[in-house]
UniProtKB/Swiss-Prot annotation:
Name listed for the protein in its UniProt record: Zinc-regulated GTPase metalloprotein activator 1
Organism for this UniProt entry: Mus musculus
Effect of gene knockout: Although mice are viable and do not show visible phenotype, they display non-Mendelian inheritance. Mice show impaired zinc homeostasis: they are sensitive to dietary zinc starvation and show decreased weight gain when fed a low zinc diet, due to failure to access existing zinc pools. Impaired zinc homeostasis leads to mitochondrial dysfunction. Mice also display kidney defects, characterized by hydronephrosis, hydroureters and duplicated ureters.
Any one GO BP annotation for this protein: protein maturation
Motif residue range(s): CXCC motif: 105-108
Amino acid sequence: MLPAVKTVEAEEEYAEDCPELVPIETKNQEEENLDFITKIPVTIVTGYLGAGKTTLLNYILTEQHNRKIAVILNEFGEGSAVEKSLAVSQGGELYEEWLELRNGCLCCSVKDSGLRAIENLMQKKGKFDYILLETTGLADPGAVASMFWVDAELGSDIYLDGIITVVDSKYGLKHLTEEKPDGLVNEATRQVALADMILINKTDLVSEEELNNLRTTIRSINGLGKVLETQRSRVHLSNILDLHAYDILSGISLQKKLQHVSTAPHLDQSIVTVTFEVPGSAKEECLNVFIQNLLWEKNVKNKDGHCMEVIRLKGLVSIKDKPQQMIVQGIHELYDLEESLVNWKDDAERACQLVFIGRNLDKDVLQQLFLTAVAEAEEQRTAPGRDGVCPSH
């Protein structure tokens, strides 16, 4: 896992207390596969206020599904029977209390990010096999996901399985097209952009035309995530659990997904999905530089002179001298490059296919920069230049 680059001042301050780095032993493929059998998956459930994410979690808590799921609720609808069982006030402060339900699920209420609740939950390991974490309606799921992603790299007992975003059919379009001051991306749009699974809820409350408009807008923002439509947040668990959106198992289905990525233009062009495929292999160090310029330095401009902001990155790439297809994943300033379980059949098949979700993205500029910095084929190489790159700060 590669974290964000610190400023020069921060680096100098950090260097004074920086411990000596020591080499660590990396796990082989078999050990990594075993980890996913023993670790507990975490799915983040997000969505704008009133979209139905708490209804979804309450549905899971009360249905019989033969799964032992621990659910961490951050918000409750008024009059919730589950809320009354969980919200225990002491000294004017709400604290968490784990409640074991009849269907084998565990549930608690928290008023923070849920990380503390998960730490306490791990003491009950053996009583559950899955964790669902609800974020607040205005939360950026990418920030929460990044914490779990980094934690997994440090040998945690949990791993991030996926991000589910619930969208209200009646008010979703209004939320997604709401303009924020100073050019900021609104919360609902960011939640859709980061989702691996998007649930369009309350479809019975709108006309087919309204639903089509919402579908088009969602697809223009996130052309990679799977979209399901539902009423009253009822969905089969197989559609939202065990997505493996961030681990090596995602490479098995990722190739098919990349072939059907939707890149329809977004109405206001603030958040879009762009994708391209380049034949041949890349040098790993060159690929790292390309990604770091996008995610860390944020110094790549589009044709209008605006710096591109990548919120989500995903792709399958061919790395020179490696037989496996490599999975590249990125959220905000974190990214990872790891081997998939699939090998390239032959050199003629090798290619790099990338999907970017973000704002001010320009496919032509991204593809040319990739070719300049990464592509191995000599006929695809162009001389390095500074065009399209912002000055470093």
